[in-house]
């Protein structure tokens, strides 16, 4: 739940720290080091809702080496220091292992799949379709959201549609494969899934990511409504009379909040382990630093801070009658 994960080199002899990924304005999620004359460091970074492989050169330049509509992770440099073992997954594919031979750029990087652990199952399943869509937010920013389409999709039909609310709150809506909130399962039940990269997510620059801190019920909630309104108005297969809202953790909080502020957009809500009462959460959590950072103060001091006052006054439990 850090605002930004950076890669830092620490000199044990001098105590000097050198931050290596300052030019990459997003999160570093995993890394490995090639013990060769080039001494390359490779890392997984999230950008525009996918997690791909990057390299840091001797000159401190960050270069992207893969560009898949998928997420890579769990990097391990192999013994020859010329190949990297990694796992890759997406909304339609559970994780498998790949061997990556890094090149100087995307075109010269080779990838070979070496496992297919679930092929005997996935071969029996109809495939989903996944599309990217960009929309202007109410404050004039460009926002990306994923559209997940059901198997055997027919553009001439109308489909019930789910707005997916991400947790974190600063976790990317990338091409994750989840065994809990699985978009393939949702779509296979006949739903279109709309998954916005709303304010407060990495992969779109620090300003976009950090905006949510202290503003849990402001711009990020308007971003959610922008996405579902765009889908309902401009995607003819979305049934605007059958919209649902789902999410876990901060996504669950978002569902609770939107249930009191959706202006009759949604017919159903599903929340998993979301914060419902922020006053109760403040006194219950062991992660006191997080609450103090996000809420700015305890609820009994809410009148001492404009941000704290706004936060507690917008706790979802205060809108159960809406």
Please annotate each region the language model reported:
Residues 1-8, 19-28, 43-54, 68-70, ...:
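A flexible loop/linker signature enriched in serine peptidases of the S9 family
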Residues 11-15, 56-61, 102-105:
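Short loop/turn segments that connect beta-strands within beta-propeller blades
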Residues 18, 22-29, 34, 116-131:
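Surface-exposed loop and turn segments in beta-propeller and other repeat-based domains
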Residues 31-40, 75-83:
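Blade-terminus and WD-like Trp-Asp/Gly-His loop motifs, strongest in beta-propeller folds
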Residues 62-157, 174, 178-188, 230-233, ...:
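Non-catalytic accessory segments flanking enzyme active sites
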Residues 143, 160, 242:
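Alpha/beta-hydrolase fold active-site loops
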Residues 153-159, 164-205:
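Short substrate-entry loop that stabilizes the transition state in hydrolases
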Residues 182, 187-188, 195-322:
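Active-site-proximal cap/loop segments of hydrolase catalytic domains
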């Amino acid at each position: 739940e850090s605002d930004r994960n950076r890669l830092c080199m620490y000199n044990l002899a001098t105590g000097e720290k050198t931050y290596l990924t300052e030019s990459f304005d997003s999160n570093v999620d995993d890394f490995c080091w090639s013990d060769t004359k080039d001494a390359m460091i490779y890392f997984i970074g999230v950008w525009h809702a996918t997690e791909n492989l990057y390299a840091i050169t001797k000159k401190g330049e960050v270069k992207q080496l893969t560009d898949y509509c998928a997420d890579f992770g769990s990097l391990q440099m192999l013994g020859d220091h010329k190949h990297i073992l990694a796992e890759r997954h997406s909304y339609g594919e559970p994780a498998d292992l790949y061997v990556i031979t890094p090149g100087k750029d995307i075109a010269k990087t080779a990838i070979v799949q070496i496992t297919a652990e679930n092929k005997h199952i996935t071969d029996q399943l109809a495939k989903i379709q996944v599309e990217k869509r960009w929309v202007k937010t109410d404050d004039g920013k460009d926002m990306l959201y994923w559209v997940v389409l059901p198997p055997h999709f027919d553009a001439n039909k109308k489909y019930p549609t789910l707005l997916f609310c991400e947790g974190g709150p600063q976790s990317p809506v990338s091409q994750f494969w989840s065994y809990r909130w699985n978009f393939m399962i949702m779509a296979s039940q006949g739903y279109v899934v709309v998954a916005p990269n709303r304010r407060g997510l990495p992969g779109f620059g620090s300003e976009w990511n950090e905006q949510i801190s202290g503003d849990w019920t402001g711009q990020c909630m308007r971003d959610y409504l922008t996405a579902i309104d765009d889908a309902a108005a401009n995607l003819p297969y979305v049934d605007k009379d059958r919209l649902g809202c789902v999410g876990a953790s901060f996504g669950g909080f978002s569902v609770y909040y939107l249930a009191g502020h959706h202006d009759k957009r949604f017919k159903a809500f599903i929340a998993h382990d979301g914060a419902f009462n922020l006053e109760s959460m403040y006194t219950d959590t062991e992660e006191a630093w997080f609450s103090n950072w996000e809420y700015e103060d305890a609820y009994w001091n809410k009148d001492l801070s404009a941000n704290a006052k706004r936060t507690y006054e917008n706790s979802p439990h205060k809108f159960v009658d809406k």
